């Protein structure tokens, strides 16, 4: 179930990086401007300012063991998917003895991993021109898992695995097909492969990009 990402108190935020200072001073006023200038997200508060009202969902919880001098210590490992359901998405992981703390760490990690997702109408069966799907086929890999995401006609829906469906929904993609290879039962690698594929939507320069640059 989607939950709203808790934001930090921006008034009390003291930036630790030059990019954070630019954001707090209003010299960078949108997340799009940040990515257009090829600047990294160096503090989670940057996302709180530039991309408010994000939502997240916990998609995987594991209990992992760590060997110490005192013996094995059990901790929770949490994987979350985060996005604004309108072109920005992220994933994050967190580990802690308490589940609540692990989720908080995963949310913080996800804020640092926000990426823009290029949307479009790339299916030859659809000519609506609306950003309901992907503009072209993209491929992502993580571990042994490979995910191919393909554009689909409007109204098709998300014909993908359940976890991948969550990822695409948070990215704002409504119609898509997918093919997968490898050990897709490993939830984290499956999600990371899908995230990698979405990241690759901006590795290609389209005709529209050339027109905008001119």
From Swiss-Prot:
GO terms for cellular component: cytosolic small ribosomal subunit. GO terms for biological process: translation. The keyword Ribonucleoprotein applies. Transmembrane segments: none annotated. Residues 54-117 form the S5 DRBM domain. Keywords: Ribonucleoprotein, Ribosomal protein, RNA-binding, rRNA-binding. Gene3D superfamilies: 3.30.160.20, 3.30.230.10. GO terms for molecular function: rRNA binding; structural constituent of ribosome. The N-terminal domain interacts with the head of the 30S subunit; the C-terminal domain interacts with the body and contacts protein S4. The interaction surface between S4 and S5 is involved in control of translational fidelity. With S4 and S12 plays an important role in translational accuracy. Part of the 30S ribosomal subunit. Contacts protein S4. Belongs to the universal ribosomal protein uS5 family. NCBIfam families: PRK04044.1, uS5_euk_arch. This is Small ribosomal subunit protein uS5. It comes from Saccharolobus solfataricus (strain ATCC 35092 / DSM 1617 / JCM 11322 / P2) (Sulfolobus solfataricus). The gene is rps5.
